[in-house]
Amino acid sequence: MVKISCNKVLSNHSGSVTVVKYNSDGGYCLSGSSDKSIKLYNVSKGSMIHSFEEHGYGIGDLVSTSDNKQLFSCAEKQLYQWDIASGQVIRRFQNAHNDTITSVCVNLDSTLLFSGSSDRLVKAWDLRTKSINPVQILDDAKDTITSIIVNEQTITHNHSHGHGHSHGNNNNNQPHTHTQKEVITSSVDGCIRTYDVRMGTLVTYEDTIPISSVSITKDKKCFIASCTDETVKLIDIDSYETLKEYKGHKNKVYKINSCSNFDDSLIISGSEDNDFYIYELLSGKLLSKLSGHSNIITHVDSHPSKNQFITSSTDCTIRIWDQSE
């Protein structure tokens, strides 16, 4: 049995905390709030390092780059790129969308930024140029985009079984690798859409229940979808079969997210009943329902290499939860 308890409460925001995310190694976390600020914390110390205060509206989403040097954030129709060390805005994408921007995501090498909006569009921005226009627009969703993931992994094809003919060399025994790049979106229209950037294809998981967020397991084999029928669904990434449903938390109105822990043994979820829910991934069993927040838990995130979690709430606080020894 995994015992989890809250060991730190961060109370630096003066408004609802809409999002909280670890940086790539889990040493720091970033939060966004309706108070229009983004805050950077040292997780182990529980201390705030910096407050980013250039947005004119409440923060909808944020993401840091894999090298932890830059930050992207959205607020209403504003899309900003920040230098984390200096706290300065590097670039403003003014009026990037025609409606509120709900989600942002950046690829691994920080060359492409993706933004999703209530205008139903996903836009891709080339960070290597100063162009004010997106390089691509994905317009397949029928309703608000609720989350975006970039899934990049190296696929190895082993040709040692003698497929094809050898043309005077022996290279067909060498494994061939390519990087699969997928952009995955969820929407209020009940669909998860997977775009293969390399192949230019789209595959759609369709349901009638609005999806308030989608994440991906650490082994990249399953989607984790938070749905407004108060379920979290574990969906096979290849067959789109629903493998497991997790029930107990409350989610009918708000954008609430879920994700797996570092080793894919647990599923964690926010909830509208103010409690933090932890499920066993394989069995679907509810392991823990943790109290502490005094209002809706809007966002949860899992440390990349241990059982530590962060939660944000409309009670204006962030809580850090650790596994008890």
UniProtKB/Swiss-Prot annotation:
Principal subcellular localisation of the protein: cytoplasm
Pfam families associated with the record: WD40
Family of the protein in this entry: Belongs to the WD repeat MORG1 family.
Keyword tags: Cytoplasm, Repeat, WD repeat
InterPro entries per UniProt: G-protein_beta_WD-40_rep, WD40/YVTN_repeat-like_dom_sf, WD40_repeat_CS, WD40_repeat_dom_sf, WD40_rpt, WD_repeat_MORG1
Record's subcellular location: Cytoplasm
Function description: Molecular scaffold protein for various multimeric protein complexes. Acts as a module in the assembly of a multicomponent scaffold for the ERK pathway, linking ERK responses to specific agonists. Also involved in response to hypoxia.
Ranges occupied by WD repeats: 12-51, 54-94, 96-135, 166-205, 206-245, 248-291, 292-325
GO biological process: mRNA splicing, via spliceosome
Protein name, as recorded: WD repeat domain-containing protein 83 homolog
PROSITE patterns attached to this UniProt entry: WD_REPEATS_1 (PS00678), WD_REPEATS_2 (PS50082), WD_REPEATS_REGION (PS50294)
One Gene Ontology CC term in the entry: catalytic step 2 spliceosome
S-S pairs: none
Region annotation Disordered: where it falls in the sequence: 157-179
Organism, scientific name: Dictyostelium discoideum
Origin: domain of life: Eukaryota
